[in-house]
Amino acid sequence: MTATLIDGNALSKTLRAQAAKRAAALAARGHRPGLAVILVGDNPASEVYVRNKIKACEDNGFFSLKDRYPATLSEPELLARIGELNRDPKIHGILVQLPLPAHIDSHKVIEAIAPEKDVDGFHVANAGALLTGKPLFRPCTPYGVMKMFEAYKIPLQGANAVVIGRSNIVGKPMALLLLEAGATVTICHSKTRDLAAHTREADIVVAAVGKRNVLTADMVKPGATVIDVGMNRNDEGKLCGDVDFAGVSQVAGHITPVPGGVGPMTITMLLVNTIEAAERAAAAA
């Protein structure tokens, strides 16, 4: 393998230690950071994500609250619970694990979270503020990717960056953060005519579509930085990303593995956002 591995586990460990230190300082002043996580239904993947988030809180000195509801929970009941958490001074961050059951409007649920507690960064107030470069919170996955660029000293100013994927959770905010950092950004997606023509010119490629082998070695410029946000399963049932790791790692300059790349960073930045919310609340108290 010629590419330098961007180790999300190692970087997460460093950033979580910093978050734990900040959490301890707040707790000493009577403002222990608190995160509420709401899980509706029994999606197995969601259960794993929620368990990992709660464990990260416990390991780093945060107060955490897990609300578990059956898939039959009504939308008004969920909105009422969010209202209670909005008013709870012990809770600084509220996260509703997606996806939600079909009868619940996820947009309405996200908009019900107070913007100052929207640690996922999905509320329209935070999404809009991201356009101005002044959000209260940056969405956790793109924020984590930016921390990777910073830690590995990947130059962004003037770089050609391609983001594959246009979701509100990763693709769009990722493109905005890269733009803010001075990169020239292209967003590609399922309707893009010649994906390879775009990626071959890119100094940075972020793959975030949830489709195996969407990026192969022949599509990558030698020495490029490749960030794999995808979470898929291969034919053997093993976790894999959107990038053909074996091939692309022979061409790229830097690459993230799956697992052990972007995944741990997402939860780490959730802790960082919760700390920032708690620090703001403490300053206003």
Curated annotation (Swiss-Prot):
The lineage of its organism: Bacteria, Pseudomonadati, Pseudomonadota, Betaproteobacteria, Burkholderiales. Pfam families: THF_DHG_CYH (PF00763), THF_DHG_CYH_C (PF02882). Keywords: Amino-acid biosynthesis, Histidine biosynthesis, Hydrolase, Methionine biosynthesis, Multifunctional enzyme, NADP, One-carbon metabolism, Oxidoreductase, Purine biosynthesis. The keyword Membrane does not apply. Catalyzes the oxidation of 5,10-methylenetetrahydrofolate to 5,10-methenyltetrahydrofolate and then the hydrolysis of 5,10-methenyltetrahydrofolate to 10-formyltetrahydrofolate. Gene3D superfamilies: Leucine Dehydrogenase, chain A, domain 1, NAD(P)-binding Rossmann-like Domain. Its EC number is 1.5.1.5, 3.5.4.9. The keyword 4Fe-4S does not apply. This is Bifunctional protein FolD. It catalyses: (6R)-5,10-methylene-5,6,7,8-tetrahydrofolate + NADP(+) = (6R)-5,10-methenyltetrahydrofolate + NADPH; (6R)-5,10-methenyltetrahydrofolate + H2O = (6R)-10-formyltetrahydrofolate + H(+). GO terms for molecular function: methenyltetrahydrofolate cyclohydrolase activity; methylenetetrahydrofolate dehydrogenase (NADP+) activity. It comes from Burkholderia thailandensis (strain ATCC 700388 / DSM 13276 / CCUG 48851 / CIP 106301 / E264). GO terms for cellular component: cytosol. GO terms for biological process: L-histidine biosynthetic process; methionine biosynthetic process; purine nucleotide biosynthetic process; tetrahydrofolate interconversion. NADP(+) binds at residues 165-167, 190. Pathway: One-carbon metabolism; tetrahydrofolate interconversion. Homodimer. Belongs to the tetrahydrofolate dehydrogenase/cyclohydrolase family.
